[in-house]
Amino acid sequence: MDNGRIVRINGPLVVADNMRNAQMYEVVEVGEPRLIGEITRIEGDRAFIQVYEDTSGIKPNEPVYRTGAPLSIELGPGLIGKIFDGLQRPLDSIKELTKSPFIARGIKVPSIDRKTKWHFVPKVKKGDKVEGGSIIGIVNETPLVEHRILVPPYVHGTLKEVVAEGDYTVEDPIAIVDMNGDEVPVKLMQKWPVRIPRPFKEKLEPTEPLLTGTRVLDTIFPIAKGGTAAIPGPFGSGKTVTLQSLAKWSAAKIVIYVGCGERGNEMTDELRQFPSLKDPWTGRPLLERTILVANTSNMPVAAREASIYVGITMAEYFRDQGYDTLLVADSTSRWAEALRDLGGRMEEMPAEEGFPSYLPSRLAEYYERAGRVKTIGNPERFGSVTVASAVSPPGGDFTEPVTSQTLRFVKVFWPLDVSLAQARHYPAINWLQGFSAYVDLVANWWNTNVDPKWREMRDMMVRTLIREDELRQIVRLVGPESLAEKDKLILETARLIKEAFLKQNAYDDIDAFSSPQKQARIMRLIYLFNTYASKLVERGIPTKKIVDSMGQLLPEIIRSKAAIKNDELNRYDELERKLITVFENLEKEAGT
C-alpha cells in the first residue's frame, strides 16, 4: 500500500499527497510518531486528515501510513467498568505502559485485554444454522451483566465447530461458521466501524419509560427507553450534575458516559463516586454496569468527534444483546465546536455563527442511532439505545445553532434555567419551556403499573404551574390580595408542587433517587390537597384559612421527600389520613 507524504500542517489538520487510492474516513498513521488520523476529504491525490493526537513537532515530507480500514472499535467482554479515551484506548493500560499521568502520542494499546480469560458457556451446537446477531454463548462479565456473544452482522451459515464450555481469551476462536463454503471463525471479540450504525430488524415505538429517579424527569417530562433528550443550559445551571444523576440512577442495564470536551475534574468526580455508589435497582456497585469515555477539554479537539461515535457504537452493541442502554454525552456543543474548528482549517464555507453547513446532518445521524429495536439474529429479543446529551449554549442563548438544530431531532427537551439555579431550585429544569413527546406513550405504563390516576395527577400539576406563571405577572403589578380566592389557591398549590415535588437534592441519600411509587404518593398528596381545597374555596372558605388549618402538615409533606425512604411508603398513609381529617373538620365548620 502506497504511503503518502505530508505537505501542510494546520493544527489538528494535516494535508498529504500521493494518496490517490485512499478512501473517505480511512484511518491513517501520520508522521514518524504514527499519530492516528482519519481522512475527511479527498481532492485528486491529496487527502485532508483530521489527526486525533497533538501534531506539534511533525514536519512536511514526513510519511503518512495508510491502514486501508475505517476507524473501528473492539467489542467484546472486558468493556464494562473501563475508562477509555476518545479512541477507545484504556487509560489504565496507558498509565501502566508509560508510568506517566499523560497519554503519550502515537501510543498503541489494545482496547480489550488480550490475556484475560473469560468463562464461555455455549448456547448452540455443531450443525445449528446461525445468522448475524445470533447468540452463540454467554460470558458473565460482571455480576450485573451477562455478556451475550453474538455472531458478527453479515455472517450467516451452519456451525461447523463450537468449543466446549471453558476459559478463553477474546482472540481464541470459539466457533467456526460455514458461510457458502468459506470457514469464518467467530471470536469473543468483534470489530465494528464507528460511523456505520449496527443493523437491526425493525424499529419499534418506545412505550416504556426510562425511569431516572429524578421526579421532574420521570413525571413532568418523561423519556422513553429508546428516546432522545437534550439538556441545554448556561454555565453553572447544573447540566453535569443532572447528567451524572441520570448515569447513576437510571433503570438502564448499561450506561455509557461520554465526557466530550468538558473539564477533567468532572470526569474525576465520576471516577471517584461510581465505585462507591450502589445501583438502586440491584444493590451492586454502579461501575459494574458503566463504561466511561473520557475525552476532556485539554485533549486534542478532533478526538471529540471520535468519542461521540465510539460511545454510540458501544451502546448499539449492548442493544443488540437485548439490553436497554443509556448514552450520556456531555456535551455535544464541544463536538460542534470541534467541527467548526476543523471546518475553518479546511477552508469550508461557514454557515450560521461559523458552524459548518453540515452540522444539522451530523447531529441527525447521531440522534437517529437511538431507538428501541427488534434485533437481528436468534433468539428474538428487543433492545434500546436512549441518548441524553448536554448542550452548552454560550450565555444560555437557546437560539444559537447547536441548540436550535438539536431541538429539531430530540423528542424530550429539559432546559436548565440559570435563574432557578440561582434561587437554589435544583434540578433547575424550566417547567414552562420544557417538553416531552413521550407523555402519551408512557402514560399507559404508569397508569397500569404505578397509579391509575397518574396521567390525571400529572396534567393537574402542569396546568397549575402554567396558570401560576400567568398569575405571577398580575401579582407583580397589583399584589396578591387583589386575586380571587381560587387564584390564591393556585399559587399555594404551585408552591407545594415546587417545594414537595420538583425540587430534589442530588446529594441527599434519600432524596437523590425517588422510586415511581414514591413519586406517585407525593403527587397524590398534592392532588388531594388541590381537589379538597378547591371544593372548600367554592363554598366560600378563604385559602388563608385552609392553609392555616393545616398547621405543620404542609411543611411535613414538603419534608417527606427527604424523610421517607423508598421502602417506607406506608408512612404516606398517615400523611393522607391527617390531610383528609383536616379537610373533613373544615367541611363541618363550613356546613354549620
Curated annotation (Swiss-Prot):
It catalyses: ATP + H2O + 4 H(+)(in) = ADP + phosphate + 5 H(+)(out). Its EC number is 7.1.2.2. It is a peripheral membrane protein. It comes from the Archaea. The keyword Nucleotide-binding applies. CDD domains: ATP-synt_V_A-type_alpha_C, ATP-synt_V_A-type_alpha_N, V_A-ATPase_A. GO terms for molecular function: ATP binding; ATP hydrolysis activity; proton-transporting ATP synthase activity, rotational mechanism; proton-transporting ATPase activity, rotational mechanism. One of its GO terms (biological process) is proton transmembrane transport. One of its GO terms (cellular component) is proton-transporting two-sector ATPase complex, catalytic domain. The keyword Zinc does not apply. ATP binds at G233, P234, F235, G236, S237, G238, K239, T240. Keywords: ATP synthesis, ATP-binding, Cell membrane, Hydrogen ion transport, Ion transport, Membrane, Nucleotide-binding, Translocase, Transport. Its main location: membrane. It is found in: Cell membrane. Has multiple subunits with at least A(3), B(3), C, D, E, F, H, I and proteolipid K(x). Belongs to the ATPase alpha/beta chains family. PANTHER family: H(+)-TRANSPORTING TWO-SECTOR ATPASE (PTHR43607:SF1), V-TYPE PROTON ATPASE CATALYTIC SUBUNIT A (PTHR43607). Component of the A-type ATP synthase that produces ATP from ADP in the presence of a proton gradient across the membrane. The A chain is the catalytic subunit. NCBIfam families: ATP_syn_A_arch (TIGR01043), PRK04192.1 (NF003220). This is A-type ATP synthase subunit A. It comes from Saccharolobus solfataricus (strain ATCC 35092 / DSM 1617 / JCM 11322 / P2) (Sulfolobus solfataricus). The lineage of its organism: Archaea, Thermoproteota, Thermoprotei, Sulfolobales, Sulfolobaceae.
